[in-house]
């Protein structure tokens, strides 16, 4: 196995572990508060803006969408992970660093959420932001990784480097 791919797997593993550890810490804290209907583990407010940590169990995709298709979503996530890993392995020499970083973030986030489904039967979300009456959907570290990876790919598409333009 090539050194570059091995280091890529190491970075993916590190991100997945960070995601899983944060979820485990929240779930262990939540376990003590299960007598409450919807316990909030931590809340902090700055004027009209607030941040809270409270576990929410999500059986769908982003923001709980398509929760009726959880088995299809699970298989789709597995195929996406396998596709990303295959691309990272077979294109390891020609892939640009920005693209590689984006794919690593996407892969780590997907693995983190698939791990939740395997171990808990649902995705564990716990980070929540609110502004006045507006509440952003609850998310987790894996979702942040997926969002950052997606933003990097969009950035790369709209602002290609000279190397990318030559390949087109």
Swiss-Prot record:
It is a multi-pass membrane protein. GO terms for molecular function: aspartic-type endopeptidase activity. Keywords: Aspartyl protease, Cell inner membrane, Cell membrane, Hydrolase, Membrane, Protease, Transmembrane, Transmembrane helix. It comes from the Bacteria. One of its GO terms (cellular component) is plasma membrane. The active site is at 125, 143. Its EC number is 3.4.23.36. Its main location: membrane. It is an enzyme of class 3 (hydrolase). It catalyses: Release of signal peptides from bacterial membrane prolipoproteins. Hydrolyzes -Xaa-Yaa-Zaa-|-(S,diacylglyceryl)Cys-, in which Xaa is hydrophobic (preferably Leu), and Yaa (Ala or Ser) and Zaa (Gly or Ala) have small, neutral side chains. InterPro entries: Peptidase_A8. Pathway: Protein modification; lipoprotein biosynthesis (signal peptide cleavage). It is found in: Cell inner membrane. The chain crosses the membrane at residues 8-28, 70-90, 104-124, 134-154. GO terms for biological process: proteolysis. It holds the Pfam family Peptidase_A8. Belongs to the peptidase A8 family. This protein specifically catalyzes the removal of signal peptides from prolipoproteins. This is Lipoprotein signal peptidase. It comes from Chlamydia pneumoniae (Chlamydophila pneumoniae). The lineage of its organism: Bacteria, Pseudomonadati, Chlamydiota, Chlamydiia, Chlamydiales.
């Amino acid at each position: 196995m090539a050194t570059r791919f091995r280091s890529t797997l190491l970075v993916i593993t590190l991100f997945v572990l960070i995601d899983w550890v944060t979820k485990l810490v929240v779930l262990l804290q939540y376990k003590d508060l299960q007598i409450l209907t919807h316990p909030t583990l931590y809340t902090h407010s700055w004027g009209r803006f607030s941040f809270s940590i409270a576990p929410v169990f999500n059986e769908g995709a982003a923001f709980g969408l398509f929760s009726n298709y959880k088995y299809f979503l699970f298989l789709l996530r597995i195929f996406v992970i396998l596709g990303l890993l295959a691309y990272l392995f077979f294109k390891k020499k020609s892939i640009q660093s920005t693209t590689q970083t984006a794919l690593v973030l996407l892969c780590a986030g997907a693995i983190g959420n698939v791990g939740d489904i395997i171990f808990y039967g649902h995705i564990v979300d716990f980070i929540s932001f609110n502004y006045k009456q507006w509440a952003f959907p609850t998310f987790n570290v894996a979702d942040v990784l997926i969002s950052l990876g997606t933003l990097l790919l969009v950035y790369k598409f709209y602002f290609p480097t000279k190397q990318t333009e030559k390949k087109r």
